[in-house]
Amino acid sequence: MSISWWEISVLCHPNLEESIFWRLDQFGCSGTARETKGKSFLIRAYVPKMQAQTLDLAALSLWLKQDAILLDSPPPLTHWKLIDDEDWASSWKDHWQPTEVGDRFLIYPAWLTLPQDGDRLILRLDPGAAFGTGTHPTTQLCLESLEMRLSVPNKEIIIADIGCGSGILSIGAVLLGATKVYAVDIDPLAVDAARSNRHLNQIHPATLVINQGSVAEVLELAPEGVDGILCNILAEVIIELIPQWTALAKPHAWAILSGILIDQSQAIADTLEQYGWVVAALWKQGEWSCLHVRRS
């Protein structure tokens, strides 16, 4: 039996994108997509009709406005409408096309026919309900940072991806030559999406290990520690996780951190310094930053 879905459309200032994705995820939305509308972003997301009433949607709209106030940004415009199951399955995908990232990656939607030629590393992806399609500046900054970090061949490199979402960064690391990647996320839907994308990219489960959890779960899997840490989540969550990385990171480990607005980067840097890390570089794209850090 076909079910109906709410299509939620949010027109927002670009620096609200991360908080809106997070809020929509907390609301239970699936299949988010983003497109540019002039100087603004239009974000679409979907939630089953049975899971949300109009009062719930009105509350969501209010929360998004409150989030914007906290981030000192203009309030977003939120609209919603009902669509049927078939429309949901195809609607958000219509707005997502292959995306070149950095010098080496081509992020390729799983439902499109693969190109016959080209010299880029093809990273096939169907994010499902998980964050990470390659269109967000933080994801692109992380992938570009991985290109730089893994440009010199290493005999062996083990990486942890904390809050892996769709698995896009983990898969990118494997394609660039990482020996082993441990990817974890507290969201079971993200774990399912990451495992599906691992299969799409024909990566062996022993090379990319994906489990539900966080730092503690990686420590159980890799008690010897890791050479690199990837973490593209909200800044306040990164601050909470930094103290736990001491036991996880090898003495000369590095980390690539994003999900961080430029004006949040100093607080991250201060916390890193308290726990024996130093910021080696800071890359920017729009309102977003990516920190390259290493153990001091």
Swiss-Prot record:
Name the Gene3D superfamilies for this protein: Vaccinia Virus protein VP39
Q: What is its main location?
A: cytoplasm
Question: Which terms in the GO cellular component ontology are assigned?
Answer: cytoplasm
Tell me where it resides: Cytoplasm
EC number annotated for this UniProt entry: 2.1.1.-
What does the entry give for GO biological process?
A: methylation
Q: Write out the similarity annotation.
A: Belongs to the methyltransferase superfamily. PrmA family.
**What's the stated role of this polypeptide?**
Methylates ribosomal protein L11.
Protein name in the entry: Ribosomal protein L11 methyltransferase
Which organism was this protein described from? Answer: Rippkaea orientalis (strain PCC 8801 / RF-1) (Cyanothece sp. (strain PCC 8801))
Q: Identify the taxonomic lineage of the organism of origin.
A: Bacteria, Bacillati, Cyanobacteriota, Cyanophyceae, Oscillatoriophycideae
